[in-house]
């Protein structure tokens, strides 16, 4: 089930669960409210999204989009707007990211013009300019764990990617890559 892209040379950190089966997420020592500063401003994006998930598909859909991020809440949060066109219809997404100064963890929430709801957050932190953010979720009736990865090692061309696991993190299927280029 694991799909490795050429751009994906980073390992997903091993995940751990408590006695109730909940994810244990601990912030890195370097986690900071400034971790997303690289993303501030406008970007153009080349998206590569898996057409179907969990069917061993190798068929990808590619499309352009734009995104603009700005800080909120005196720097412990940020918001971005994601604009694209799917099937000749306008699509808008919005991300809210909040940094908890006590736990040093980021919570990332997503909403879009299709669902009109705020998704459960993915939670995590950055280490060495790479962030991993996890959550338990349900995808088409399956219990899954999802991970968002932010790779900011090249701050002018960051890469966001998403993977899901239906076997508690033993195997991951990458299903979306966003290759960004800063425009300001």
Report residues per predicted region.
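Hydrophobic small-molecule pocket/channel-lining residues, especially in calycin-type beta-barrels
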Residues: 3-184
């Amino acid at each position: 089930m694991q799909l490795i892209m050429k751009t994906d040379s980073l390992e997903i950190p091993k995940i751990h669960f408590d006695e109730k089966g909940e994810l244990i997420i601990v912030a890195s020592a370097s986690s900071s409210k400034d971790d997303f500063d690289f993303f501030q401003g406008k970007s153009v994006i080349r998206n590569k999204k898996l057409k179907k998930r969990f069917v061993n598909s190798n068929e990808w859909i590619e499309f352009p989009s734009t995104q603009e991020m700005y800080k909120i809440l005196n720097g412990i949060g940020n918001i971005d707007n994601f604009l694209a066109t799917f099937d000749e219809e306008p699509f808008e997404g919005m991300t809210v990211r909040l940094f908890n100064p006590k736990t040093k963890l980021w919570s990332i929430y997503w909403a879009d013009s299709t669902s009109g709801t705020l998704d459960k957050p993915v939670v995590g932190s950055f280490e060495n300019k790479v962030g991993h953010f996890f959550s338990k979720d349900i995808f088409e009736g399956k219990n899954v764990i999802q991970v968002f990865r932010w790779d900011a090692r090249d701050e002018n061309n960051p890469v966001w990617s998403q993977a899901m696991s239906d076997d508690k993190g033993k195997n991951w299927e990458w299903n979306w890559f966003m290759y960004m280029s800063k425009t300001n």
